[in-house]
From Swiss-Prot:
It holds the Pfam family PapZ_C. Displays ATPase and GTPase activities. The keyword Nucleotide-binding applies. ATP binds at G13, M14, S15, G16, A17, G18, K19, T20. Keywords: ATP-binding, GTP-binding, Nucleotide-binding. GTP binds at D63, L64, R65, G66. This is Nucleotide-binding protein lmo2474. Gene3D superfamilies: P-loop containing nucleotide triphosphate hydrolases. Belongs to the RapZ-like family. GO terms for molecular function: ATP binding; GTP binding; molecular adaptor activity. It comes from Listeria monocytogenes serovar 1/2a (strain ATCC BAA-679 / EGD-e). The keyword Mitochondrion does not apply. Transmembrane segments: none annotated. The lineage of its organism: Bacteria, Bacillati, Bacillota, Bacilli, Bacillales.
Length: 291
C-alpha cells in the first residue's frame, strides 16, 4: 500500500461561475480531474487513489448536478477531514447575480434548479443552498469581472505555489457608491476622513497622485486609524493563515473609490507587503470618465 499524502481540491460553487475553466486549469497543473463525482462515492474514490503510485494530486468538480449533492456533501467532507492521508482544499467559485443571469442568457441554458422557471430564482435558491459550503471553503473566488484567461491565471498563481506555503493578502480599494466587494473578508470604511474631492485641484486626481496622497495622510485621524488598522491586521493575519486560508481579501472603501481609499490601500498594502505576499488593486478608480 502506498504511504503518501494525497492532495484533493474540490471545485464547487455557483453554476455558471467558471468551474469548468478551473478544472481545466488544474488539469494543466498536473491534477487528475474528475467531473461531477457523487459525494457519497468520495471516500471510496479516495481509498482507490491511495493505492495508486501515479496520482497524488486530484481535483474533483462537485455541484448540484449530482441529485444527492446537498444531502451527502457535508458528511463526505467531514469524513475526509478525519482522514490523515488526505489534504483537502475547497475552491468555491461565485459571481454576482446579474453576471450569472447574463452568462445564462448568452449560452441560452436553463438553471439546473429551475429548468422551467426563472434563472434568477434558480440562482437565489442555489446561493442559499451553498452558503454553508462556501463558509467552509479555503479559497473563494468571485469571477464577476474575470475573463476565462484571468481565472486561469488566478488558479495558476494559487496552486503553482501551493507547496511553498503561500498566504496571499489582497488589498483592494473601492467606492461604496458602487457596492461592497462581494468577495471581501474584511471591509473598512474610511469615509470619516477629510475628502479631497471637495478641493477643486484634487478632484480629477486619485490617491495615487502625490498631492492627494499627502493631503489624505496629513491628518492626525488618518495616522491614528492606520496605526490601529495595521496593528489589527498584523495581529490577526497569522491566525487566518493558521486556519488554512490561502488568501485574505481586505477592502478599504470611501465614497467613490478615487481618493481616500486608494491612498490608504497603498499605504496598508506596502506595509503588509513587508511580511506577507500582497497584491494591491483599485476596483473603482477607472470608473471616472476620461481615465
Amino acid at each position: 500500500m502506498a504511504s503518501k499524502q494525497l492532495k484533493l481540491v474540490i471545485i464547487t460553487g455557483m453554476s455558471g461561475a467558471g468551474k469548468t475553466v478551473a478544472m481545466q486549469s488544474l488539469e494543466d497543473l498536473g491534477y487528475f480531474c474528475v467531473d461531477n463525482l457523487p459525494p457519497s462515492l468520495l471516500p471510496k474514490f479516495w481509498e482507490l487513489m491511495k493505492e495508486s503510485d501515479k496520482m497524488d494530486k486530484i481535483a474533483l468538480v462537485m455541484d448540484l448536478r449530482g441529485r444527492e449533492f446537498f444531502d451527502s456533501i457535508e458528511p463526505a467532507l467531514d469524513e475526509l477531514d478525519n482522514t490523515n492521508f488526505i489534504t483537502t482544499k475547497i475552491l468555491f467559485l461565485e459571481a454576482d447575480d446579474k453576471v450569472l443571469v447574463s452568462r445564462y442568457k448568452e449560452t441560452r441554458r436553463h438553471h439546473p434548479l429551475e429548468p422551467n422557471g426563472s434563472v434568477l430564482d434558480g440562482i437565489n435558491a442555489e446561493r442559499e443552498l451553498l452558503s454553508d459550503l462556501k463558509g467552509r471553503s479555503q479559497l473563494v473566488i468571485n469571477t464577476s469581472n474575470m475573463a476565462p484567461r484571468e481565472l486561469r491565471e488566478r488558479i495558476n498563481n494559487e496552486f503553482q505555489t501551493e507547496d511553498k506555503d503561500i498566504f496571499n493578502v489582497q488589498l483592494m480599494s473601492f467606492g461604496f457608491k458602487y457596492g461592497i466587494p462581494i468577495d471581501a473578508d474584511l471591509v473598512f470604511d474610511v469615509r470619516f476622513l477629510p475628502n479631497p474631492h471637495y478641493i477643486d485641484k484634487m478632484r480629477p486626481l486619485t490617491g495615487l497622485d502625490e498631492d492627494v496622497y499627502e493631503y489624505v495622510m496629513k491628518w492626525p485621524e488618518t495616522q491614528t486609524f492606520l496605526d490601529k488598522l495595521v496593528d489589527l491586521l498584523m495581529f490577526t493575519l497569522p491566525f487566518y493563515k493558521r486556519e488554512g486560508k490561502t488568501q485574505l481579501v481586505i477592502a478599504i472603501g470611501c465614497t467613490g473609490g478615487q481618493h481616500r481609499s486608494v491612498a490608504l490601500t497603498e499605504f496598508v498594502g506596502k506595509t503588509i507587503q513587508q511580511k506577507y505576499e500582497t497584491t494591491i488593486s483599485h476596483r473603482d478608480m477607472k470608473r471616472r470618465k476620461g481615465r
